Regions:
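Bacterial N-terminal signal peptides
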Residues: 8-15
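Membrane engagement elements in two modes
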Residues: 20-89, 99-101, 106, 110-121, ...
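Buried hydrophobic-core signal for structured, non-transmembrane domains
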Residues: 92-94
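N-terminal leader/targeting segments
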Residues: 3, 18-21
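Long, charge-dense
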Residues: 130-131
């Protein structure tokens, strides 16, 4: 009987690990899907529901020192998780496979690909009620959030060596009328 319980526990633990992308190439978690289809990085796993205690966690490998773009799509009708519709906690764990050290890291939201999100489009890093307790990094000591003319979150005062895996946590609010938006990830490298 104990052996059966151990096997059941192991199977349950495996079911909590993201098994891979769906047939459409997207990774599903919470009310959204996530895609590395624009290149420069690849997703290893996506888990979580998007709540504060169970954030959506994206494990990825960044192969470039140039900005890369994560495609985020509403995957199903928005559920209520104790915060406004279209809001979720996100944790991004990124392996630095660029071959260069990073001295800062920036995230930018875009409702239209290539055009920074503005104050009025309904997409933000929680601009209506910013809470610094919801923003974190294990490699950078401080962050700056900018809501005008764009929605950017820059992490600074730290560094990430090649093959290191920094983690970033933040809250995204999405009350846009569109079902697809973008998260640009921009590692900053030292220059001489």
């Amino acid at each position: 009987m104990k052996r059966h319980l151990r096997i059941l526990a192991a199977l349950l633990a495996l079911s909590l690990i993201s098994a891979g992308p769906a047939d459409d190439g997207r990774w599903y978690a919470g009310d959204y899907s996530f895609s590395d289809e624009l290149g420069g990085f690849h997703i290893l796993s996506v888990t979580g529901t998007g709540t504060k205690v169970d954030p959506i966690v994206i494990n990825e490998v960044l192969n470039s020192e140039s900005p890369v773009t994560l495609v985020i799509r509403a995957a199903k009708p928005i559920q209520h998780h104790g915060f406004p519709e279209g809001a979720f906690h996100l944790r991004v764990v990124t392996e630095n496979n660029s071959g260069l050290a990073w001295i800062e890291f920036e995230f930018e939201l875009q409702e239209i690909l290539g055009k920074p999100s503005d104050f009025y489009d309904g997409l933000s890093f929680d601009q209506t009620n910013p809470n610094p307790d919801l923003i974190s990094s294990n490699r950078f000591a401080r962050f700056e959030s900018h809501f005008e003319k764009f929605d950017r979150l820059r992490f600074a005062n730290g560094h990430v060596d090649p093959l290191d895996r920094p983690a970033f946590g933040f809250f995204i609010t999405d009350v846009t009328p569109v079902t697809e938006f973008y998260l640009v990830q921009d590692p900053r490298v030292p220059f001489s």
